[in-house]
């Protein structure tokens, strides 16, 4: 999509993402095209491609581009997956998942954010996305199992419903830790036993709280 932000998008990919080690060509190509500035308030459009998160209202944020790329890369998407996203937020991460997977199911607890994200995603033609308003820590049982699950808010621990809804061999990426700083963790389910998991620490991060039954209390 050619627009006045095209050069900023390409610079973002080169200096913030490729330069920091995310080299997946599908991610780089998609992030070179997705108009991130449409997912923030118009007054912040000129800051959309900077290396930092931005407020999107309701005390929520759009993550910095590098973190979006890093988390997406950890999901190891090939193009045919069914993906669950917890925390639609602005819809930018959702759009990237829609570019890289076959089906995306996204849950957002704040109705105004969910509705705005749906509007933008429809405007951009992402029709392989379903959005539901509710408590994302329960997952989306009727659509499970999922090949990959991405959580875009910090949890005190791994919500067990998400492990239960993950395919064997499926990947779950989420921030786990305190309310102000977390570790970004990749969890791979190894068998039918929901306790048989491989966990990898991808580094420190800061996310808003995951609010819900299996997260933080509101």
Swiss-Prot record:
Which residues are the signal sequence here? none
- Reactions catalysed, as given in the entry: [protein]-L-isoaspartate + S-adenosyl-L-methionine = [protein]-L-isoaspartate alpha-methyl ester + S-adenosyl-L-homocysteine
Q: Which residues form the active site?
A: 63
Give the keywords, sorted: Cytoplasm, Methyltransferase, S-adenosyl-L-methionine, Transferase
Tell me the Pfam families matching this sequence.
PCMT (PF01135)
Pull one GO CC term from this UniProt entry. Answer: cytoplasm
Q: Which family does it belong to?
A: Belongs to the methyltransferase superfamily. L-isoaspartyl/D-aspartyl protein methyltransferase family.
Q: Which NCBIfam families match?
A: pimt (TIGR00080), PRK00312.1 (NF001453)
Q: What does this protein do?
A: Catalyzes the methyl esterification of L-isoaspartyl residues in peptides and proteins that result from spontaneous decomposition of normal L-aspartyl and L-asparaginyl residues. It plays a role in the repair and/or degradation of damaged proteins.
Q: In its UniProt entry, what is this protein called?
A: Protein-L-isoaspartate O-methyltransferase
Q: Which gene encodes it?
A: pcm
């Amino acid at each position: 999509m050619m627009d006045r932000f095209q050069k900023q998008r390409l610079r973002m990919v080169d200096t913030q993402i490729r330069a920091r080690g995310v080299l997946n060509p599908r991610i780089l190509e998609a992030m070179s095209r997705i108009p991130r500035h449409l997912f923030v308030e118009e007054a912040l459009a000129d800051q959309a491609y900077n290396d930092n998160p931005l407020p999107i209202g309701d005390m929520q944020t759009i993550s910095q581009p590098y973190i979006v790329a890093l988390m997406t890369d950890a999901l190891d998407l090939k193009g045919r997956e069914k993906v669950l996203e917890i925390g639609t937020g602005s819809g930018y991460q959702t759009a990237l998942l829609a570019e890289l997977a076959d089906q995306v199911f996204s849950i957002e607890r704040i109705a105004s954010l969910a509705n705005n994200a749906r509007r933008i995603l429809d405007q951009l033609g992402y029709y392989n996305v379903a959005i539901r308003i509710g408590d994302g820590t329960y997952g989306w049982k009727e659509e499970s199992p999922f090949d990959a699950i991405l959580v875009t808010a910090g949890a005190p621990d791994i919500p067990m419903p998400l492990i239960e809804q993950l395919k064997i061999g499926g990947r779950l990426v989420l921030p786990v830790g305190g309310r102000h700083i977390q570790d970004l963790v990749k969890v791979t389910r190894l068998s039918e036993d929901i306790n048989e998991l491989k966990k990898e620490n991808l580094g420190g991060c800061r996310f808003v709280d995951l609010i819900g039954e299996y997260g933080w209390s509101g």
